[in-house]
């Protein structure tokens, strides 16, 4: 049975990486419902948050394949119950309608929307929440002449995660290129090059 999964992918910031990741989804005919990319809590490491609707077996296989990419450090997949997630939406509404209709103002307050731009001809409101809340406000504002609407990709934090920081520190500690090289001839250079 298909379930909604959120994949959290920790990567290096490399040109073309988004394309490599997208190709992996495309080859498997997996549709991306949402995709967000941002810096993580560690400098130089980026975090992709991708939402898909697939079976657990397909997602597990995809995770294994993604982790084989050179620039990918770690991939996690979680159900909605295992994460805290939000989206942001912007709604553009005719200012005259807002001033005239008390219901609209009450509705915006009920959904926790706040004005980010107020002009004579329109007002832009911002609301954060989950799909149901954002779509419900969209449905309600459509009754009052909604001019424009846009919704962001999902951002999520894994509830039981300790973050990737400790894993990165362990990887750095085990990196063979970082270990000091002992050169037995370092202090005897005058003797080595004598003829």
PLM-predicted stretches and their roles:
Residues 1-46, 51-195:
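Long, contiguous binding/interaction regions
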């Amino acid at each position: 049975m298909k379930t909604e999964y959120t994949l959290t992918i920790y990567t290096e910031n490399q040109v073309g990486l988004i394309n490599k990741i997208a190709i992996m989804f495309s080859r498997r005919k997996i549709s991306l419902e949402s995709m967000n990319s941002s810096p993580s809590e560690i400098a130089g490491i980026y975090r992709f948050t991708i939402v898909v609707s697939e079976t657990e077996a397909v997602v597990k296989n995809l995770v294994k394949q993604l982790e084989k990419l050179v620039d990918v450090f770690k991939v996690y997949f979680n159900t909605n119950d295992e994460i805290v997630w939000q989206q942001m939406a912007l709604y553009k509404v005719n200012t005259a309608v807002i001033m005239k209709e008390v219901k609209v103002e009450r509705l915006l307050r009920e959904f926790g929307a706040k004005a980010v731009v107020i002009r004579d001809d329109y007002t832009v409101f911002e609301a954060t929440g989950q799909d149901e809340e954002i779509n419900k406000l969209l449905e309600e504002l459509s009754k009052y002449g909604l001019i424009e609407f846009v919704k962001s990709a999902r951002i999520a934090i894994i509830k039981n995660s300790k973050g990737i920081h400790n894993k990165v520190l362990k990887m750095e500690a085990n990196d063979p290129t970082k270990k000091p090289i002992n050169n037995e001839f370092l202090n005897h250079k005058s003797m080595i090059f004598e003829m």
